């Protein structure tokens, strides 16, 4: 779901990724015995913030790009990746209505807006609260992570209206998480409006998929420090 139905513009942007991604593929292809976590650590070492930004923009997934860009890499990154593997599996089991993808040293969790909000609204539905309650249980089990909440819309309406709506929705989710006991210091909010579609906006199905909220889950400084210490032992 994350890597199909891209717009023509996004396909053009992705051409610029080919040399970069080929380099990563060549590195990892020679390491067939690596685990998913170890491969994530290798990608983190090779990537860096610049590549993360390029990948995020070209794929229409800024959460994915930010995780790649913030990767620590090496042995420390592998330890963080192992912890993220466990958290991702727990989210998949606990929140079946969410799409969960493991990327390097982080996790992207995506909810369709129809699960969280009524059309053109920013107040959470009862179904939304039920799904977020499930996610909150897992987030509390892993307190040493930061959570960036990103709002996205389709292209219906004006850019300004959609930008404002995306921010309002992300803020609604953040406020609910904080109200339910997730530390506000872990939460940041971003709204992207219609600027980063992952799917075509020419169809009702594509527009529905573009109306989404994404969670970027990454290691905080405490987890990074502990992983670095463990890697040196």
Segments and roles (model prediction):
Residues 4-21:
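Bacterial N-terminal signal peptides that target proteins for export
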Residues 27-30:
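C-terminal motif of bacterial Sec signal peptides marking the signal peptidase cleavage site
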Residues 32-89:
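Short, low-complexity, glycine-enriched hydrophobic/amphipathic alpha-helices that associate
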Residues 41-42, 46-53, 66, 86, ...:
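Extracytoplasmic/secreted proteins, especially bacterial periplasmic and envelope-associated proteins
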Residues 57, 78, 82, 94-98, ...:
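Structured segments of extracytoplasmic/periplasmic soluble domains
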Residues 84-111:
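Amphipathic, membrane-active segments
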Residues 93-94, 117-151, 178, 208, ...:
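Periplasmic peptidoglycan-binding/anchoring modules of Gram-negative envelope and division proteins
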Residues 152-226:
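Periplasmic OmpA-like peptidoglycan-binding domain that tethers envelope proteins to the cell wall
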């Amino acid at each position: 779901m994350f890597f199909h139905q891209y717009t023509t513009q996004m396909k053009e942007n992705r051409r610029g990724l080919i040399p970069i991604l080929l380099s990563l593929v060549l590195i990892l292809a020679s390491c067939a015995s690596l685990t998913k976590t170890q491969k994530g650590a290798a990608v983190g070492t090779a990537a860096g913030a610049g590549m993360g930004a390029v990948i995020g923009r070209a794929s229409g997934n800024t959460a994915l790009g930010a995780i790649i860009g913030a990767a620590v890499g090496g042995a420390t990154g592998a330890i963080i990746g192992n912890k993220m593997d466990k958290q991702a599996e727990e989210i998949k089991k606990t929140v079946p209505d969410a799409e969960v993808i493991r990327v390097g040293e982080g996790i992207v969790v995506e909810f369709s807006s129809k699960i969280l909000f009524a059309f053109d609204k920013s107040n959470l539905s009862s179904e939304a609260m039920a799904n977020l309650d499930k996610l909150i249980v897992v987030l509390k089990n892993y307190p040493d992570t930061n959570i960036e909440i990103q709002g996205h819309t389709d292209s219906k309406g004006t850019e300004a209206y959609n930008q404002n709506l995306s921010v309002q929705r992300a803020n609604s989710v953040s406020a609910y998480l904080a109200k339910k006991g997730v530390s506000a210091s872990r939460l940041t909010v971003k709204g992207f409006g219609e600027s980063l579609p992952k799917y075509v906006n020419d169809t009702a199905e594509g527009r529905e998929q573009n109306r989404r909220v994404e969670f970027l889950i990454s290691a905080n400084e405490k987890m990074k420090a502990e992983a670095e210490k463990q890697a040196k032992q």
